[in-house]
Curated annotation (Swiss-Prot):
Highest taxon, organism lineage: Eukaryota
Protein name: Protein FAM228B
Family: Belongs to the FAM228 family.
InterPro entries referenced in this protein's UniProt entry, alphabetically: FAM228
């Protein structure tokens, strides 16, 4: 390399053109040190390029992961806020209303007790099995207000079940298109439940499908049958 530089400097000083190499000189093998130097330069350049790309990819990946963490945190915050507004607050409000209604509960119990004492003093005794509703009805208050001591809540639009709600809306829309009828969500759930039960074989005399009085009327031979024993 130094020889080539000296030659070029000498040519520039003398003002003569550099001597062109012959084809034989071009075809002569270069020295091993010269080839190693060229290979090292290429290797270093390739390594620097790879390192630069790797650093760039790592920075972009970290930036993307941080952004995803921020979005997930924000999504959880918004989901919790909607859950509090649609589920927690209405439920808490309803519970507080029922807790604060203890005065009405005491008043009703006192009235029921007074009616019972009046009837007992008049008749001498009172039996739940035998009573005349015209004279004394122990279930009068329950008939007048069947929702007493019951907390009736409107259906919640729970954001945690949004996927299930969307799926139910889609199925209900398909059912309405097939039948040409408009169904409420409650009606749709009843139809879906009936369709689900229809897939399984029904047992006419199963304990789950009978009332207590109906079960008492079932013959003892059926209750002690092999089928019932296996299903226990």
């Amino acid at each position: 390399m130094t020889t080539m530089k000296n030659r070029s400097q000498d040519d520039m000083v003398t003002g003569t053109l550099p001597k062109l190499k012959s084809s034989k000189e071009w075809l002569e093998p270069q020295s091993l040190s010269f080839m190693e130097a060229l290979a090292k330069e290429d290797t270093d350049a390739a390594v620097q390029s790879i390192l630069y790309r790797e650093n760039y990819i790592m920075k972009e990946l970290d930036k993307y992961l941080h952004h995803q963490d921020f979005l997930n945190t924000r999504r959880k915050e918004m989901l919790y806020k909607k859950w509090v507004e649609r589920v927690a607050d209405p439920l808490q409000k309803k519970i507080i209303e029922k807790v604060h209604s203890h005065k009405n509960i005491k008043k009703r119990r006192r009235q029921e007790l007074d009616n019972f004492l009046k009837h007992s003093n008049k008749k001498g005794n009172a039996f739940i099995e035998h009573y005349d509703p015209k004279e004394y009805d122990p279930f009068y208050m329950s008939k007048e207000d069947p929702n007493f001591l019951k907390v009736i809540m409107p259906p919640f639009r729970d954001p945690l079940k949004k996927a299930q709600y969307d799926q139910d809306d889609e199925k209900r829309t398909l059912l309405q298109c097939e039948t040409g009828k408009i169904y409420t969500m409650k009606e749709f759930k009843e139809i879906e439940k009936a369709q689900l039960h229809s897939r399984f074989p029904s047992i006419s005399n199963s304990r789950q499908s009978m009332t207590p009085n109906g079960w008492l009327k079932v013959p003892m031979s059926y209750i002690e049958s092999e089928f019932c024993k296996k299903s226990r």
